[in-house]
Amino acid sequence: MPALRRAAALAAAAQPVLPGANRVPGAASATAPLVSFSTPLLFMKALLLAGLLAGAGAPAALAQTPNLPPVKTTSFRADTLSILKYGAVADGQTLNTESFRKAIDACTQAGGGVVLVPRGLWLTGPIVLKNNVNLHLAKGALVQFSANRADYPLIKTNWEGLDAVRNLSPLYGADLENIAITGQGTFDGAGDAWRPVKKSKLNETQWDKLVASGGALNAKKDTWYPSEQSLKASTMDKPGVLTASKTDIKDFADVKDFLRPNMLSLTRCKRVLLQGFTIQNSPAWTIHPLLCDDIIIRGVTAKNPWYGQNTDALDLESCRNGIVEDCVFDVGDDGICIKSGRDEQGRKRGVPTENFLFRNDKVYHAHGGFVIGSEMSGGARNLYVQNCTFMGTDVGLRFKTARGRGGVVENIFVDGVDMTDIAGQAILFDMYYAAKDPVPLKGESTAPPEMKAEPLGEGTPQFRSFFIKNVTCKGAETAILVRGLPEMAIKDISIENAVLEADKGLVCQEAENIRLKNVTILSKETKPVLEIQNARDITLDNIRYASGAEVLLRVSGERTKNVKVSNTNTKSAKKDVEMGANAPKKAVSITKS
């Protein structure tokens, strides 16, 4: 028990070192303590939290927690340099790119410190971060990035898990250590100058106004592009991706307008703090750490238009060791998203995203609240989600992949998620992801194609060892959808202590060792409440549902076997089990409570 008390004390006391007698006002935020541990999982979490938050001074026993090393925190000199000293003008008209560059260069050359952005409207081109610099936005500071695409040079970088050429990100850093962006100001990425827009995502007035602003329409007149060059590039196959025949930046000059940058891009950086600010109107992904270690993201708000294509809030790609807490996301694509490279390139890189804690985060509009995939070819593991809230997302917990991705996703722990008004699935495991919106647009379908088993290979993805408990959802299209591949079942999923209100209940296909315990499913459609197809070793323990359901459980598929129902009042349904096509007669056993 002394170790637990020490873990709690460390978790309560630890916080990143910030400037201003070493602190800038408003930049610090205390970490909530842990006070009790009633299960082995909570014991693991205590060690995780202590390790993540304690830093280099943690006792050796905690630092040695398997696969959960401590997060190393940032530390800065108290010296503060204002961008005003370097000629910046807050009139919303003067381009302050050089002033930001000079201030950041002077700060890093002096050994580091704080670059202060005072209150005001600051127009600028891209800002390139440097070692040992904390870029701090005062309350009321608005950094407006230029809408002139010519202000952003092309660079070699990464796009959706592949080596590619893109425009330089508005906020950019590579191969840095000990960096921060803090404060209570706002960054605006001028995303409307970059993004295509689908007609189906706007009302008539909005669409007419957008078309009248200029740009170009595709042949079907259902997608708007900011320029003719952007439209032309949209018809090409992976126009920004580096290939054997296109290896130089100049090879991509004719499609520059199409190559949207991610808004905040950090590559191969160590000891990163992002805290307190608002970041909005991104051209593409909003916050994208790639191959970064030791990341703390605290109290950050990301806001993008709901129609914004690819405007994920946070994409952690092949990153290790961090905490994301008290953040608020309201965007046009995924909310919190875990990635690790795409297909062969991701597998060759072989760096999973691992050892992260996500807690007390809120996601409003997004394709998914907490998401893994689909670009997860390097794998993901040891991720903890605690006490998060999703309101109005398309999917709540969204785990997506597809054939060809490869990668292993494992050891995912979720404890405490509340959801309302989920348009699609509250909990989704899907190996049929096809880069479509999770909620079909008019004329689209999300039904999986008929697929036969294929030989296993390095491109076969794997989902296994997920532990989900204490989840509530008030309103969804489907409570739980588990959809594996014929050649690779989704395995070892535990869902416990959940109350899920949805139109449909459970759909489980191509899965193995799935366990539901103390789960209430309040579905409008009750024929059936639970549907299992080609799945094995399914445990349904103390399942509650609305009285008078037509069919509690339907099973089908010749590979279905060992479905066990226990501690469940099967008499509340008009029919307890319905055997569908090709289902073995002894596939289901019911233990009366």
What spans do the regions from the language model cover?
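N-terminal polybasic/positive-inside topogenic patches
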Residues: 2-3, 8-22, 26-35
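Extracellular cell-wall/glycan-interacting regions and their flexible linkers
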Residues: 14, 38, 564
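Bacterial N-terminal signal peptides
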Residues: 45-57
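Extracellular/periplasmic carbohydrate-active domains that bind, remodel
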Residues: 62-593
